[in-house]
């Protein structure tokens, strides 16, 4: 195998900002943000808008998650 062509596989914390859910797992995602985890170590932090903790399919609850105003823009454009 060639040297130095594979991404860095490391421990990363994913933070679902919608439900404030955090999980420590391994990933190749790169980020400049870090967070202090429960074990006292600092880990890279990746923020996500939706995960299984907030997705309606997994939670069984229907809720509208509009982070960029697309619903308001659509309703304004096609209002009668």
Swiss-Prot record:
Protein's GO biological process: translation
GO terms for cellular component: ribonucleoprotein complex; ribosome
InterPro entries, A to Z: Ribosomal_bL28/bL31-like_sf, Ribosomal_bL31, Ribosomal_bL31_B, Ribosomal_bL31_sf
Keyword Magnesium: no
Family according to the record: Belongs to the bacterial ribosomal protein bL31 family. Type B subfamily.
Database matches in HAMAP family: Ribosomal_bL31_2
Full protein name: Large ribosomal subunit protein bL31B
Species this protein is from: Stenotrophomonas maltophilia (strain R551-3)
């Amino acid at each position: 195998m060639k040297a130095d062509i594979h991404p860095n596989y490391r421990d990363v914390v994913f933070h679902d900002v919608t439900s404030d859910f955090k999980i420590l797992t391994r990933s190749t995602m790169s980020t400049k943000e870090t967070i202090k985890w429960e074990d006292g170590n600092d880990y890279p932090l990746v923020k996500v808008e939706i995960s299984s903790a907030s997705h309606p399919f997994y939670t069984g609850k229907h809720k509208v998650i509009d982070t960029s105003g697309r619903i308001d823009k659509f309703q304004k454009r096609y209002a009668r």
